[in-house]
Every structure is written in structure tokens, then in C-alpha cells.
Amino acid sequence: MSTILNVLTDTWSPRAKKLEGDAKIWAIGTATPANWVDQTTYPDFYFRITNSQHLLEHKEKFRRICNKSKIRKRHLVLTEELLKKNPNLCTYNETSLNTRQDILVAEVPKLGKEAAMKAIKEWGRPISEITHLVFCTTSGVDMPGADFQLTKLLGLNSSVKRLMMYQQGCNAGAAMLRLAKDLAESNKGGRVLVVCAEITINIFRGPSLEQDDNLLAQCLFGDGAAAMIVAADPRPGLETPLFELVSSAQTIVPNTDSHLKLHLREMGLTFHCSKAVPSVLAENVEDCLVKAFEPYGISDWNSIFWVFHPGGNAIVDRVEERLGLGPEKFRASRDVLSEYGNLTSACVLFTLDEMRKKSKKDE
């Protein structure tokens, strides 16, 4: 797929006087599996559980990748017990898609439910008022989909309007915001529940001496789910917005198809990321910002707050350097990367939640 840049112009709105018109985020909820791994000790665990301890040079290379990642810990559904029960997950090229699918189809909706319940609780309105559900995950494909299963788990109305998005990767978080904005602004009285849930079982496998990209994948990704309530027309006195979604845009950078590729195979989801990705993003992001903010007379990138998807530490560093941003601008993104790793579609929503928490503390 081509490299995709998403820009959402969000206005911090507790003090906003005019709330009618644009879609707003009314609540955010997040959830992670209870199990987590320490990034400093993960190389030992990974090479032991995959029976690869004899690959000493490869293990040291993986340790260096983990140390440079700026990730402190990651939450994972995969436990040692689960891996021992399913040893075919631990070999690089082992046929294992059925095993992965069986786990994901059951667990993804459950994790999504945890995040959704937190968002609904913060929203404070009856669950029966939800009119739309949009669900996305890169973790498994099934029919009926995770949206259908979540509808049952939450007890949503059988008439709720559902949309399921699979295999959108890191792009999906911003894409879901854009989709929710369009739905909310096109349906008076609509209350859109957005859920992004990711479990990385599909990408876990043992090391390969030929595929260094695999080591990056084993170091980078974590499991988590995020949910939001989005609507355009508030009920005075009953709902309080967190963010206003003013505009949205998406851009494809030409001739970048080879830079980032994930393919679903019998061995699970394979991962390829070229070393050029941080540079490609850094070199193209400002053009997107100019197009997004020029109508509002904004050209100082340090004058706005940032909810940046922390795809990896090198990406964050390169974009920050290219735009001349102060160190505080990506603080929320770096904190999410440190505490959770790259959560794929859910990552930008975790960052949005972290931003609003930090903003409240700073008020």
C-alpha cells in the first residue's frame, strides 16, 4: 500500500461557545490486556519461547532494536502458556493461520467491549441512544464480523447501523475519525460508537535469518483497544464535548507502495517496512499541514497541539526535526509509544486520550 498521511484538524473545545455543526468527540475509553512484557527482558523471553537461543548474534541484534525503540513495555494477549499450547505460532514459516484466527475471532470483540464500556460510561447516556457502530481491526477477518459480535456483547439495538473495516493498519485510527465525522454530520441525532481493537497474534512468529523486518515487528507492536462516542448535535446540559473535529483529509504519497507492506499468508500477517519510511513521512507531512491549516491562517506548527500516531521512534524523531517542533509537542505520542508500543489503529486514539488528560492537568 502507498504511504498515507492523515491530517485531522481538531480544536480543543471546553471553552468553545459555538458547538453546533461540526462533529465532536464526547467520550474516550481505552483497554489493554492484563498481560504485559518488559522491553528490556523481552529478547530473552522471545528467543527462549521460540527455541532460538542458539541464534546468539540474531538475539543481540534484536536486543539492540528493542533498546533503541524507546518502548518501556507492551501489553500482549499472547502469554507463555498460550504459546506453549500453540507451538506452531513460534516458528517463522509454520502454517498457523487457523490457530491465529481462532484466537483473534474470539478475543478482538472482547477487548473492544472493554474500551467501549469505558467510553459509554464517560458519555453518561443510555446505550440505547447509540445509532451507529464502526469497528476496525487489523487482527483477523471473519463473517459475521467483530462489529456483529460487539453488538451482541454490548446489547446494542438490533437496528444499529454497523460498518466493519478490516486490514487498514496504522492508517485506520485517523480514517475512523474521518468516517465518524461524516456519519455524525450526516445523521441528525446520530450517536456514533467508534471502536478500534488490535491484537498482534497475527504478526508473532519466531526469528528468521533472512527477514530482519520480522525482528522490528516483534519489537514494535502491542495490543489494545480504544473507543469513542462521536456526534454533531449536543443535548444541552446532558453532553459535554472533549474535541471538535473541524476538518479531515487524506493524502497518498506517490511511488511509495514498496515502503510499507503487510501480507496475509498461511503463516499469519507478514511485515515489511523499509528504512525510508521515516524520511518519506517527514518530507511530505508539511505539504499536508499547509493544505489543512491555510484556511485558518495557521502556519506556526508549534502554535497547535499534536495528536501524532507514534508509528516508531525514528518516525517521531524525523517529523519533529523536519517541522522544528518543540519537545513538548510530541510528548503525548512519545508517552503512548513508551507505555504501549505501536497499537496500530488504536494508537492515535490512545494518544488523543493522553492529550486530553495532559491538557486537563495543565489547565
UniProtKB/Swiss-Prot annotation:
<keyword id="KW-0012">Acyltransferase</keyword>
<dbReference type="InterPro" id="IPR012328">
    <property type="entry name" value="Chalcone/stilbene_synt_C"/>
</dbReference>
<dbReference type="InterPro" id="IPR001099">
    <property type="entry name" value="Chalcone/stilbene_synt_N"/>
</dbReference>
<dbReference type="Pfam" id="PF00195">
    <property type="entry name" value="Chal_sti_synt_N"/>
</dbReference>
<dbReference type="InterPro" id="IPR018088">
    <property type="entry name" value="Chalcone/stilbene_synthase_AS"/>
</dbReference>
<dbReference type="Pfam" id="PF02797">
    <property type="entry name" value="Chal_sti_synt_C"/>
</dbReference>
<dbReference type="GO" id="GO:0016210">
    <property type="term" value="F:naringenin-chalcone synthase activity"/>
</dbReference>
<feature type="active site">
    <location>
        <position position="170"/>
    </location>
</feature>
<comment type="function">
    <text>The primary product of this enzyme is 4,2',4',6'-tetrahydroxychalcone (also termed naringenin-chalcone or chalcone) which can under specific conditions spontaneously isomerize into naringenin.</text>
</comment>
<comment type="pathway">
    <text>Secondary metabolite biosynthesis; flavonoid biosynthesis.</text>
</comment>
<comment type="similarity">
    <text>Belongs to the thiolase-like superfamily. Chalcone/stilbene synthases family.</text>
</comment>
<keyword id="KW-0284">Flavonoid biosynthesis</keyword>
<dbReference type="InterPro" id="IPR016039">
    <property type="entry name" value="Thiolase-like"/>
</dbReference>
<keyword id="KW-0808">Transferase</keyword>
<dbReference type="GO" id="GO:0030639">
    <property type="term" value="P:polyketide biosynthetic process"/>
</dbReference>
<dbReference type="GO" id="GO:0009813">
    <property type="term" value="P:flavonoid biosynthetic process"/>
</dbReference>
<dbReference type="InterPro" id="IPR011141">
    <property type="entry name" value="Polyketide_synthase_type-III"/>
</dbReference>
<protein>
    <recommendedName>
        <fullName>Chalcone synthase B</fullName>
        <ecNumber>2.3.1.74</ecNumber>
    </recommendedName>
</protein>
